[in-house]
């Protein structure tokens, strides 16, 4: 009986040692993975926060932007314009290169009855004031002149960080450093796994644009999902429309390694490529004089 007890104790000790060794093995295996995961999360967070800080730190910028946006019929509409922009208070001068080459837009928040001054560059060659949502100003594009630049982009990211907390960075894949347009860029891909179409009950007098603005959604997407409704049409109380719960399903960014601006943005919905924006000739350091946001500035044709 003593022999059997000793044998049983010995077997238990061997099993305990085996479990202990297996535990050490798992720790050794998983610790580097956990450490690498943590380091990558820190890097992703650092890139995103530096990007937001850089955007918020530059009130005046000038740039040339190329856009390619999917239309309601599935074809892509391209355009290009040059702009001088002040983020706060919002002011922008833009000159079209395509389509509507030579057309100019001047919008100053709170001035001219909050309308944009437009030189359409065609007969009878007079400048007219329009609501910023007017279709002529969009040139068949997705966004109005008030959404140009990076401010909306910054607000979008901040809303997602507030909503998801640190879990937001789990959506992000760090793809490495790439040379793009002769600039070294961090490339990140954001997959919004919970993106979906939902029903929305409208408040009295809301418009599609206001719903998009208040919920950080893509107004063009709402327009396509509700083709019978104009952006500025006032909706009825409890009217049911279809919206998305997030701006995009997937977002690919090339973030300039030097200045941390997202100079190439590729946006996907549930169908595929929805829109992309390319920023070139980005100038972050010049001072734009007040007269440059005036119709009297030399070189403008208002």
What are these regions (language model features)?
Residues 1-4, 17, 27:
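Methionine residue identity
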Residues 2-5, 9-12:
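Acidic, Ala/Val/Gly-enriched low-complexity intrinsically disordered segments
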Residues 12-23:
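Bacterial N-terminal signal peptides that target proteins for export
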Residues 24-32:
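Bacterial N-terminal signal peptides
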Residues 37-42, 47-50, 68-70, 100, ...:
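Non-transmembrane domains of secretory- and envelope-associated proteins
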Residues 43-124, 172-176:
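N-terminal mature ectodomain segment of secretory-pathway/periplasmic proteins
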Residues 212:
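The alpha-helix within a helix-turn-helix
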